[in-house]
Every structure is written in C-alpha cells, then in structure tokens.
UniProtKB/Swiss-Prot annotation:
Cofactor, free-text remark: Binds 1 zinc ion per subunit.
The name this protein goes by in its record: L-cysteine:1D-myo-inositol 2-amino-2-deoxy-alpha-D-glucopyranoside ligase
Enzyme nomenclature, EC number: 6.3.1.13
Subunit structure, as described in the record: Monomer.
Catalytic EC class: ligase
GO biological process, any: cysteinyl-tRNA aminoacylation
Binding-site residues for L-cysteinyl-5'-AMP, renumbered to this chain: 66-69, 81, 104-106, 246, 268-270, 302
Catalytic activity: 1D-myo-inositol 2-amino-2-deoxy-alpha-D-glucopyranoside + L-cysteine + ATP = 1D-myo-inositol 2-(L-cysteinylamino)-2-deoxy-alpha-D-glucopyranoside + AMP + diphosphate + H(+)
Length: 444
C-alpha cells in the first residue's frame, strides 16, 4: 500500500516515485565576514586513508554529511558532529573553494516509527516536529547549512532508481520479499573502515544490521528494500511495495546532488561501519565508478555519565535544554570547539561556565578601541584549523591575543593597532563561527 499522506511528494497513486523533488528547507546561512588574505589547504584525518593528509581538492568541493533520524531533540553529540562539517566548510571557503554541501534526513526509519507508536503520534508529525527543532538548534549555533537538505521520503524515487540499477547489475537478491545487496559485488568493500571480519559482524549487529538472518548469502549483506509490513509506511516500486534500506538512501541522494564521486563524506565515527562502508559499496557498484568518496572525515563520540550519548540509553544533554536554561548559543559553540573532532570526550557541568568566561574575555577584548597586531592571530587560527581542524589550538591563539589586549588596557602602547579588535572579531566570526558582537567605533 502507498504511504497514506496525501501530501507525500514521493508517493503517487501508481507507478514509481518521481525524481523531481519537493525540497526540504534547511536553515539560514549566517554572514561570513571577508578576511584579509586567504587560508591554506586542508589537512585532515581520513579514515579510509588511515592518517592525516592534505586533501587534493578542486575549485568546487562536494561534501556530504549524514543527517539525523528525527525522533528526538538535538543532543550535544549531534551538535559536535555538525560543528565539524561547519568548520570544514569555513576552512574550505577561506581557502578560496566553492563548497557544495548536502545533508540528508532519515525521516522514515525503524527508530522513528517505534517512537511514534510509543508516543501515540503520527510518524510524520513526529519527524516534522524534531526537524523543526533541529533547524532551530543549528540556527542558534550558527552552523553553516547545507545547500540541499533532503528527506528520505521526498527522495524515494531516487532511491528506487538506484536499487533498480543494483538489481539489473546482479548485485541484489531477495530474502522473503526483502531485497539485499551482495557485498561480494563490491571489490573494495572493507576499504573505508578497515575492520576485520569479526569486527564487521559485531558492528553490523550493533548498528542496524541483521547478520543472523537466515537466507542471506553473507551475514554482512545489507538491506536495500524492506517489503511492506502491516502498519508501516510503504511506497510502490518495481520490486513490490516497501521502503528503502538505510545505506542506499545516502548513496542515491549524494549521487543526485553531487555526482558519482564526492570529495568528502562526513558523519560520526559510529557511521564508518556499516553505514559509510555500505553506502560506498552501493554507489560504486551502481555508478560503475570508484571511489565513492575521496576522503572520509569522522567525528568522535561525546559521552555523558561514562557512556556515549545515546537516545537508546537516554544519557543526553540537549542543545534546546541548554538554551532554555539561558545559555548563550556562542558559549555552547565554544564549549564544543574546545575539543578536537577526532578525540572522544566527556560532557560535564563545568563546560558551560568555562565557555561563558572565555566568551566574556573575548568580547571584552574586541570591545577595546585598539589591540595587538591582528596578523599573527589570524595566521595562527588559519593554520590551526587547516591542520586537521585543530579548533582547540585556534581557541588558544585567540585566548593569547585577548589576554594581551586586555593587559594593554585601552591601547596606550605605540604598538597598538586600531584595526585589530574589528579584524579579530571578524576572524572569530568567519573561521570559528562565534559571534562576538559589534566593535564600537573609536571614541564611543
């Protein structure tokens, strides 16, 4: 049966879903101040490569980051992830690149359906509510938005097309009406996460796979198309009514908006396997082009009470909750920026007061009529961020400038620079995304 929503753009009365999409809206793009000079090429830890390397990028960089499954509010682990790709964008733009950025929303999936049933709410209403909250959180944190923010529901037609291609290429098979992808069809399977077979099986079972299902050719074979079940949303397709598997959703959306090969695939480190491994395998077999992504940039996990923040465990701190308690969004952003994106860390209650104190010092420093030369701090912030997104190092550089500016007071020294406060404010805004407010004209 087709999805029951009369407004669903991916659910016509009959036939395959169309590929003309009704675009989901992202959030506002904050203004980026223009800085003197230009940044340098980005070096970053590439999971598939196994080390930090300088990315070989053209004038236009194609970035894809996996988005939320909207059944709960944005927690700080989510915020830390999307802050990472915000920094990637800022560094690339400062280096003179154009960035084409796509992010999906998994707005139909088992956890969403289960939560909607538990709470007695229509799954579409739940998704809309949480997507709206996510947008508000991203806006408050000044996260640079994607050019295309794409829900799975609106992209079902694209996904059906890719699954059909995989069927035609002999890379798919049926198990009791469900379609599975054969990992044997992907020569490079395993080259993203570099796990051994035993590790793959464990990760597959922990992250949405079904390695123990009878009838599968390989326990690691991922689901492409889930046949219609009673009470679940479904869409028509050449292989029967149903809904997409998780991994192929991103493969199809990325191909439609960015092409067969993208430059950077992003997401939390828990997505490296099986999600990014399988998405790459689907895309490479369907497209006949390898690799799917030239680099994989993964963000470390954030813990609370000794465990990774997890919706299933419930040990979460939400952005919206911090905002409701009166936290300055810029302080929340600073609390996240003080951690390197590749290092797992623990959220504590002390994080916000420390970030608020830092924010106050920076705002006081840029409010002075003059300050130390801006050129060293601008160069250092650029260098730190271009070197594997070293946000803690960039913050330390601004700390040093602010301390020197405040120590000098109103700038009576002959070495003081009238332009420094405004330029440092713009540096922090453009590269770190932290709003320090306007710098008052001299003499006010």
């Amino acid at each position: 049966m087709p999805c029951s929503s009369p407004a669903c753009p991916a659910c016509p009365a009959a036939g395959p879903a169309p590929v003309t999409l009704t675009r989901m809206q992202a959030w506002p793009f904050p203004q980026l101040p223009k800085l003197p000079g230009q940044g340098r090429d980005l070096r970053v830890l590439d999971t598939a490569h196994g080390g930090v390397r300088t990315l070989d990028l053209g004038p236009t960089v194609r970035l894809y980051a996996c988005g939320i499954t909207p059944y709960d509010a944005t927690h700080l682990g989510h915020a830390f992830t999307y802050l990472t790709y915000d920094l990637v964008q800022r560094v690339l733009r400062d280096a003179g690149h154009e960035v084409r950025y796509v992010q999906n929303v998994t707005d139909v999936d088992d956890p969403l359906l289960e939560r909607a049933t538990r709470d007695g709410i229509d799954w579409r209403d739940l998704a809309r509510r949480e997507i709206d909250l996510f947008r508000a959180d991203m806006t408050a944190l000044r996260i640079l938005p994607p050019d295309h923010y794409v829900g799975v529901v609106e992209a079902v037609g694209l996904i059906v097309d890719m699954v059909s291609q995989l069927v035609e290429r002999g890379a798919a098979y049926s198990v009791d009406g469900d379609l599975y992808f054969s990992v044997a069809a992907a020569p490079d399977f395993g080259q993203v996460a570099h796990l051994d077979p035993a590790q793959m099986l464990v990760s597959c079972a922990e992250h949405g796979g079904d390695p123990g299902r009878p009838g599968k050719k390989d326990p690691l074979d991922p689901l492409l198309w889930r046949a219609e079940r009673p009470g679940e949303p479904s869409w028509p397709s050449p292989f029967g009514p149903g809904r997409p598997g998780w991994h192929v959703e991103c493969s199809a959306i990325a191909r439609h908006y960015l092409g067969a090969t993208i430059d950077i695939q992003g997401g939390g480190s828990d997505l490296a396997f099986p999600h990014h491994e399988c998405s790459a395998a689907h895309a490479e077999v369907a497209n006949g082009a390898r690799p799917f992504a030239r680099a994989y940039v993964h963000t470390a996990l954030v813990s609370l009470d000794g465990h990774k923040m997890s919706k299933s465990r419930g040990n979460l701190e939400f952005v919206s909750r911090l905002l409701a308690r009166g936290a300055d969004p810029a302080a929340i952003r600073l609390a996240l920026l003080q951690h390197h994106h590749t290092v797992e860390w623990e959220w504590t209650a002390a994080a916000m007061p420390a970030a608020a104190e830092r924010l106050d010092r920076w705002r006081a420093a840029v409010a002075l009529p003059s300050g130390p030369d801006f050129r060293p701090v601008l160069a250092e912030v650029r260098d730190r961020l271009a070197d594997d997104l070293d946000a803690p190092g960039a913050l330390a550089a601004v700390d040093a400038w602010a301390a020197a500016a405040l120590a000098a007071g109103s700038g009576g020294s002959g070495e003081a620079d009238d332009q420094a406060p405004a330029t440092v404010r713009d540096t922090v805004d453009s590269l770190l995304g932290v709003d320090l407010g306007p710098v008052l004209p001299r003499g006010t």
